[in-house]
């Protein structure tokens, strides 16, 4: 039967094939490569080793709570948010220790589009380790050193190599980087 394509129906989306994480995975890899390019350009370091540190479980919980609060209540009032967070047993220690971290996370969240924020709310958990591991070959290719040593650690890893304590600067979707 010969039919014109213009008379055919549009294809339908198969939601089971769609991953909420895919856009964040790709953006995480792109941002990591871009950040490393900036660091090497400014410092004029030729990287031999690159260490990437992902945020702790507590920081991820804090991020999720901030994201929910900002999206549901449409407010990012730092004082109001801090009062709530210091009473949350799950995250109060990190909040009291580092109010600047809370401020930076709020800025991170507000810098993203509403669509990105809404998608991230729907994601139960986002593991930065998997896309970062997948991005190592792209990073090596970009730098032009296929033998470049790249290690990825969680901030919580007790055996991580972190001579400058860079891991403490990691935030969800914003891994910390150390280059030798």
Per-region residue spans from a language model:
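Acidic, turn-prone loop/beta-hairpin segments
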Residues: 1-34, 53-56
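Short secondary-structure boundary/capping segments
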Residues: 1-4, 65-74
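Active-site lining segments that contact anionic ligands and/or coordinate catalytic metals
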Residues: 2, 45-51, 172-174
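Short, solvent-exposed polar/charged micro-motifs at secondary-structure junctions
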Residues: 14-19, 60-64, 159-166
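Ordered, soluble secondary-structure elements with a strong preference for glycine-centered loop motifs
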Residues: 23-27, 63-65, 126-130
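Beta-strand-rich binding/interaction modules
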Residues: 29-49
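Short glycine-rich, basic-tinged beta-strand/loop micro-motifs
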Residues: 43-69, 100-103, 109-122
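C-terminal edge-of-domain segments
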Residues: 79-180
């Amino acid at each position: 039967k010969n039919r014109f394509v213009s008379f055919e129906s549009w294809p339908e989306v198969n939601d089971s094939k769609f991953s909420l994480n895919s856009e964040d995975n790709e953006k995480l890899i792109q941002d990591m490569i871009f950040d490393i390019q900036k660091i090497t350009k400014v410092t004029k370091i030729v990287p031999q080793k690159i260490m990437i540190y992902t945020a702790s479980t507590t920081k991820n919980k804090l991020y999720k709570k901030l994201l929910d609060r900002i999206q549901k209540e449409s407010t990012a009032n730092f004082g109001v948010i801090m009062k709530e967070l210091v009473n949350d047993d799950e995250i109060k220690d990190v909040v009291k220790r580092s109010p600047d971290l809370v401020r930076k996370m709020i800025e991170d969240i507000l810098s993203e589009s509403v669509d990105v924020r809404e998608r991230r709310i729907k994601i139960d958990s986002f593991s930065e380790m998997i896309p970062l591991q997948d991005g190592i070959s792209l990073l090596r290719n970009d730098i032009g050193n296929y033998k470049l040593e790249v290690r990825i650690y969680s901030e919580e890893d007790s055996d991580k190599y972190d001579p400058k304590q860079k891991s403490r600067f990691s935030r969800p979707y914003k891994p910390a980087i150390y280059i030798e």
